[in-house]
Amino acid sequence: MFTVDMVDTLFKYSKFMYECGNYTVASVCLYYYRNLVNQADPNYLNALYGKLASEILLQEWEHARDDLLKLRAYIDANPFDTEWELVTQRAWLMHWALFVYYNYPKGRDEIIEMFLNQQPYLNAIQVLAPHLLRYLAVAVVTSKSRQKNSLKDLVKVIDIERHSYKDPVTDFLTCLYIKYDFDEAQEMLQKCEEVLSNDFFLTAVLGDFRESARLLIFEMFCRIHQCITIEMLARRLNMSQEEAERWIVDLIRTYRIEGAKIDSKLGQVVMGVKSVSIHEQVMENTKRLTLRAQQIALQLEKGRQDKVKAN
């Protein structure tokens, strides 16, 4: 007969195996423990984190992703006593997610979906973990499938937070999309390379980031100036004019740079101007106000919790 004491022993044994470095056994034991107890069990959350940690250390990224999603579902069900505890757990979950998503195929797209597109998690970043904006920014810049649709929303968030948090990655996007300072953007890109090469999670995506960032600079430069000579680009790229023209053609075709055209007769790259409707402007400003209002609400909740603890 299987008793409650046996279940407790299974949890303690799992913890012991984990601390001994036997992550395979710990993972198996925690899998059974998680299925034997209900979510009201006091060790249920610990078991979820323990199973996730074991799979990360085993570098079993498929299993780790499944465990991350189970942990997220539990946290989103909000079994906590206060709203502040829920926000804190979401912040911790995003830190753990970095281990998984920066090693999982298409994981960077899932970072965008979780960190940027899910408002409760974006709120947690703004209030408790603005340093996660670096990892979100790198994910957006290097994502070929989501960059175009996500970049505008990311820049809005960075613009809101730039007075309270900045690093070379967010500063690069600030220079490019808010200040329109291309010289400073180039300087920040060099600093980004140094930062990424020393970042545990980002060092493997340095090449992708460098390439994508240069393309963003090229696209924005052409948009601002609307017209740029191929000869000037050739000098900057250290290419012949013919090589530069082929490079630009491949660039436009591969990355589908909106509105870009080459006038071979005049030797120019011409960028079409896209007008923004009044409706789009209203929607963008409304979204910005909503982000700010939610951030203020969470900061007030944090202040209330701090006051309760002080008393």
UniProtKB/Swiss-Prot annotation:
Spell out the PROSITE patterns in the cross-references: PCI
Kindly list the biological process annotations in GO that this record carries. Answer: formation of cytoplasmic translation initiation complex; translational initiation
* Subcellular localization(s) per the UniProt record: Cytoplasm
Q: Which UniProt keywords apply?
A: Cytoplasm, Initiation factor, Protein biosynthesis
Xref: Pfam families: PCI (PF01399)
Q: Would you name any one GO CC term? A: eukaryotic translation initiation factor 3 complex, eIF3e
What's a Gene Ontology MF term here?
translation initiation factor activity
Domain PCI residues, every copy = 100-280
Q: Which InterPro entries match?
A: eIF3e (IPR016650), PCI_dom (IPR000717), WH_DNA-bd_sf (IPR036390)
- Which proteins does it associate with, and in what oligomeric form? Component of the eukaryotic translation initiation factor 3 (eIF-3) complex.
Report the sequence similarity comment from the record. Belongs to the eIF-3 subunit E family.
What does the function comment of this entry state? Component of the eukaryotic translation initiation factor 3 (eIF-3) complex, which is involved in protein synthesis of a specialized repertoire of mRNAs and, together with other initiation factors, stimulates binding of mRNA and methionyl-tRNAi to the 40S ribosome. The eIF-3 complex specifically targets and initiates translation of a subset of mRNAs involved in cell proliferation.
Q: What is this protein called?
A: Eukaryotic translation initiation factor 3 subunit E
